Design a protein with these regions (language model features):
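Extracellular/periplasmic periplasmic-binding protein-like sensory domains
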Residues: 230-302, 313-316, 356, 366-387
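Periplasmic-binding protein-like
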Residues: 87, 91-100, 120-122, 165-168, ...
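Sec/Tat signal peptide C-region and signal peptidase I cleavage site
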Residues: 19-23
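Extracellular/periplasmic Venus flytrap/periplasmic-binding protein
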Residues: 82, 127-130, 135-236, 270-281
Length: 387
């Protein structure tokens, strides 16, 4: 077992921060700061597992002795900010990988980047960090949040839907989701409801949908909200109305949704059956190690580790300016295939319409139906003045 793998095994098992690090030019320290407890834990666990899988395959990232410290942000901005600060200032983290949620990204970006570290998000992609608040030391291996919703709006537009019912929880991400959908959908809106955060009973909303009989429904209902909505949608006999979604039916929720989600649609930058050699190898290795189908969070964590390795090798070490310059060139082969960074350090990549299928082995997964956007850059990049 390599030194890297020994350190991963020791450090990934705990959320406690390590003792102060000695500055060593030949040692890389990576902090992995993700939501690993509470309702959002399944997403953080997937991102962590994908990252650690790639790190184990790589061995020594960039040919350097590698120390990986895994920390739980508890999905609390104040906790996350303190732990990010400790990772950089106390533990000497050169790079912090995280977070899952956008409000956590807002809390940790300053402690990491002003403390001298580089922040690489394997999921969160808030509009401000893609636009006016972009930073040289912030990168995302995921997407800008609006893009998944734009995929579904474009699909609805292409299908000629004229009467779509919109559903999302009443908080900023929910409001942004429906706004993103409308950026690429110009048809009529049958109804628009913002539900309570954490709501689990959708009988009233489903009754309205049944009465209105819209051309389709678009929903953004992440986590347990999505599990319940999908089950109740099927139980209400509404499966004849196309169900379009983002962050509602994916590999994180499908084990609980199962047959109820079959045939439902989602927007994504990836699916387990994306046809690249790197993706086939990743999915096989992930399932062999963890026993379940990887989700987009796992893929983005996996790509983050491979990006770091490639940039370190190109930069020749952890010098911050050289490493940022190397990261900008995206010197790795993504499991997604084509991948580059825009001027705001967010990916330029393809986006797909996916649907839920049951594989021959009985497991549920998303599957690509068609490509919606090719080499798509987010709408906020033009507002980024990197400084």
């Amino acid at each position: 077992m390599t030194q890297t793998r020994s350190l991963i095994a020791a450090l990934a098992a705990t959320t406690a921060l390590a003792a102060p690090a000695m500055a060593q030019d030949d040692t890389l320290t990576v902090g992995v700061l993700l939501t690993l407890s509470g309702p959002g834990a399944v997403l953080g666990e997937m991102a962590r597992d994908g990252f650690l899988l790639a790190a184990e395959e790589i061995g020594e990232m960039g040919g350097m002795e590698t120390r990986i410290i895994v920390v739980d942000d508890e999905q609390k901005p104040d906790v996350a900010a303190n732990k990010a600060r400790e990772l950089v200032e106390r533990n000497g983290a050169d790079i912090v990988v995280g977070p899952i949620f956008s409000n956590i990204a807002g809390a940790i970006v300053q402690p990491v980047t002003q403390g001298g570290g580089i922040l690489i998000s394997p999921n969160a992609g808030p509009s401000n960090l893609a636009g006016a608040d972009c930073k040289p030391a912030f990168f995302a291996t995921s997407y800008q949040n609006d893009q998944m919703h734009e995929v579904m709006g474009a699909h609805a537009q292409a299908q000629g839907f004229q009467n779509v019912f919109l559903l999302a929880p009443n908080y900023q991400a929910g409001q942004d989701a429906l706004a993103g959908f409308k950026k690429s959908y110009t048809g009529g809106v049958a109804g628009e409801i913002f539900t309570q955060m954490g709501q689990l009973d959708y009988s009233a909303e489903l009754a309205q949908i049944a009465a209105m009989q819209p051309d389709a429904v678009f929903a953004f209902m992440p986590g347990g909200m999505g599990v319940n909505l999908v089950r109740q949608y099927r139980q209400a006999g509404l499966e004849g109305i196309p169900f379009l979604s983002a962050f509602t039916v994916d590999e994180a929720t499908l084990p609980a949704q199962a047959e109820a989600a079959l045939g439902f649609f989602a927007g994504s930058n990836w699916a387990p059956d994306l046809d690249t050699p790197e993706n086939a190898a990743f999915v096989a290795a992930y399932e062999a190690k963890y026993g379940h189908v990887p989700g987009v969070y796992a893929m983005q964590g996996y790509d983050a580790a491979r990006l770091i390795d490639g940039a370190l090798r190109e930069a020749g070490g952890t010098d911050r300016d050289a490493l940022i310059a190397a990261l900008e060139g995206a010197p790795f082969t993504s499991v997604r295939g084509d991948f580059s960074f825009g001027p705001n350090h967010f990916p330029i990549q393809d986006f797909y319409l996916t649907t839920v299928v049951q594989r021959e082995d009985g497991k549920f997964a998303t599957s690509i139906v068609e490509k919606i956007f090719d080499d798509y850059q987010d709408n906020y990049a033009a507002n980024c003045q990197m400084n």
